[in-house]
Amino acid sequence: MTELLQSLNTQHEFVGRHNGPNHADQQKMLSTINAESLDALIAQTVPAQIRLEKPMQLAEAQSEADMLASIKKFADLNQVKRTFIGQGYYNTFTPNVILRNVLENPGWYTAYTPYQPEISQGRLESLLNYQQMVMDLTGMDIANASLLDEATAAAEAMTLCQRAGKSKSKVFFVADDVHPQTIEVIKTRAKYFGFDVVIGNVDALPQTEAFGALLQYPSTTGEVRDLTDVIAQAQANKTLVSVATDLLASALVKPAGEMGADVVIGSAQRFGVPMGYGGPHAAFMATREQHKRTMPGRVIGVSIDAKGNQALRMAMQTREQHIRREKATSNICTAQALLANMASFFAVYHGEEGIRTIARRTHHMTAILAAGLTKSGYELAHNAFFDTITINTGDKTQALYAKAQAADINLRLLDGQIGISFDETTTVADIDALFAIFDVKESVNALSTDIAGNEFAAIPEACRRTSRFLSHPVFNTHHSETQMMRYLKQLENKDFSLTHGMIPLGSCTMKLNAAAEMIPVTWPEFGALHPFAPIEQAAGYTALAEDLKAKLCEITGYDAFSLQPNSGASGEYAGLIAIQRYHESRGEGHRNVCLIPSSAHGTNPATAAMVSMKVVVVKCDENGNIDLVDLAAKIEKHQENLSSIMITYPSTHGVYEEQVKEVCEMVHAAGGQVYLDGANMNAQVGLTSPGFIGSDVSHLNLHKTFCIPHGGGGPGMGPIGVKSHLAPFLPGHIENGVEGKEFAVSAADLGSASILPISWAYIAMMGADGLTEATKVAILNANYVMERLRPHYPVLYRGTNGRVAHECIIDIRPLKEETGISEEDIAKRLMDYGFHAPTMSFPVAGTLMVEPTESEDLEELDRFCDAMIAIREEMTKVKNGEWPLENNPLVNAPHTQVDLMEEQWDRPYPREIACFPSAATKRSKYWPTVNRVDNVYGDRNLVCSCPGIENYEE
């Protein structure tokens, strides 16, 4: 290539698009922090003993166009065939108004979990709609705002039954007609809780002494039966009964809640979310009022703001793992907010009548198929069904299945049976094609006419739904596309996302989610595949997954990866299981002590508790490092039973601990394993790696370091990497499992497969040099922010040379003592300046943790620093008595447009200071839509359903 051609090459252009500061800005920043060069800063920050000895070996960086061409080759290897497998996954139509305005819209997918409710009212409303939808369709009292997938929700239901029940039994009963992938995830969870899983016929439940049970309704083979008596008899025996159900079926069949279920779980996938070869999808859980504080996952509640107006918030947050730690109800952190929002909008768009029509059509098509088959001499396993039939095909099974495959049709292959599931996309042509496979000569129209006289004959009368659902006005207002488009925009406008400005949340890595990375997500070649389709039809997914795993191994220094875990917390769980199985394989199953530094993320102790480990806390010194003396003492005390240590690197205090290799060596010498939490991998890539440091296993947050967007609270992915000795203990899967069939942690083998292309695309476009540069720039940005703020705020922890890693902790405690202004006041005041708050009170109470990421440019960093410095000056005015402590811009923050227009302004500061405190806000202003939300009121007056219409009229 000539010199001119080389100079005009745009192959590496993406790196400059992804990283915020250009070269000139980097030089200014380096001057501000007194570093000679970027490499000099890295040398001062990252301990020499953990620096990689050679660069990562990855393919040359690709341009956006080349990357999309490469990923299209993977997509083209996938074969999208007509699929009638069912088993919890169905084709669906994603309404285009939702596809374009939500799934493909950075205003929705780049937001963070709504911990700051004043700037999250839009998606809080949508998630409240989701809860209302689930409550209505299941017939239950309260629902959460989503879980990771149906199988995980079932495992969570099991632990809820154990916590909430009065039985002393250790048995959990699972009906043998529950989806097989769900049973496997339950078995994994039960093993480490010490529960005995008994699998049997539904009718055996009342005779089984069990603390809890899981039934499937309709069953995995499609049967619809009245479970009322079975549930009542089990409950009389102190058994809490959970039921896995189908939301679309619940539009026609009697809801599980009306049959007496204590817990109802399932997946909302078929409400407009593509199958995506397994995910991501929003699961749900609903329960009775008395179990609300035992229910895992996030719950949206109705509260009031400082003016007494209705405001939404996440309720009962004290149940969450970051507060309860090893006593938490679950280790769940990431949920599936974006997918829950899509499902809730599906219900809003269609309403009761639309959902019922979709259900009627699906059922009618199934009834036509069943009638044609039975008239042609085939026997059905069940004559009562909604959308799924199972045909007793005996010795013809393999021949019929092969005939279907030859016709490019996927059916469910069972032992001597074939299953067929229909959905909203099923056509008359599909039925004709199936009739041809089974040599049925009947006419679809004639069969339809016969059935019309008794449309619901296949649903037993006791199982027919008579109650209304989706009667709230929100589900009966937005049925034209214009109405829906405006409703979606109205909600989006209430929320702060990366489209508005920096989200400097420490430990969350809110970096750019580039448009090019997102494009393949909605391609049907990735979206329309059933996770249990024959593996050869998913050759593209297999190749992409293997290539991504190889890339991740190179980046992390590990030898093997599993992509199955659907979140960081799920990855932690899979990683600790791998450690425990390894110990068991060596006859050391007694090793159950997990050492966790006091600075650790709350998920760590919560996960350790889920694997029945005894958590022993290791002290940190005054600089935030692991106290080696205390570590040595704890290792000596627990040496015989030491299983592992869980560390985060760089530490959650935002520094590179010098002695991390020594920590690993000490634990290994005592027979333990090292779990390195990958939450802060964004400060490692290309500079060091978990494998090089000496760790045995890590999860990676693909939704942090590797650019999968946070989606306003999910999806996420938490794949785990391991050294070779732990590779045999990675999660398996009953369908297409590469690592064997046991110890699954997710419903599908590749977890949320359809978002894997995002991380693959990011790595492909950055290349080894680009990824390394991103890490360096993330460190530069953090140190720049730290140095600009240090004259005004105490910085809690810094490394040996006075540097921080990719985030820094600002200590508000001494300032609160001095001025009376808290970290919460600062967080809320930042909203007036057009920012999302940093992480509050983690890992140290009374602090703010700031992580700017590499994607923010110098102008945005300065805008943030200027806002923080201005807020510090406002605090001084409170201290000096210019503004009273109980009435100032900080304690009254955030301010809304309604505040600005108040006729009576009874505050000692002008409206301009309240609403336009900086020059930047006069140019462009994001407005919170409510005043400060009253958390105490919300939890004392818990309402987790949609408010009445009068609240909207106000």
UniProtKB/Swiss-Prot annotation:
Pfam families: GcvP2_C, GDC-P. One of its GO terms (cellular component) is cytosol. Keywords: Oxidoreductase, Pyridoxal phosphate. One of its GO terms (molecular function) is glycine dehydrogenase (decarboxylating) activity. CDD domains: GDC-P. It catalyses: N(6)-[(R)-lipoyl]-L-lysyl-[glycine-cleavage complex H protein] + glycine + H(+) = N(6)-[(R)-S(8)-aminomethyldihydrolipoyl]-L-lysyl-[glycine-cleavage complex H protein] + CO2. Its EC number is 1.4.4.2. The glycine cleavage system catalyzes the degradation of glycine. The P protein binds the alpha-amino group of glycine through its pyridoxal phosphate cofactor; CO(2) is released and the remaining methylamine moiety is then transferred to the lipoamide cofactor of the H protein. This is Glycine dehydrogenase (decarboxylating). It comes from Vibrio vulnificus (strain YJ016).
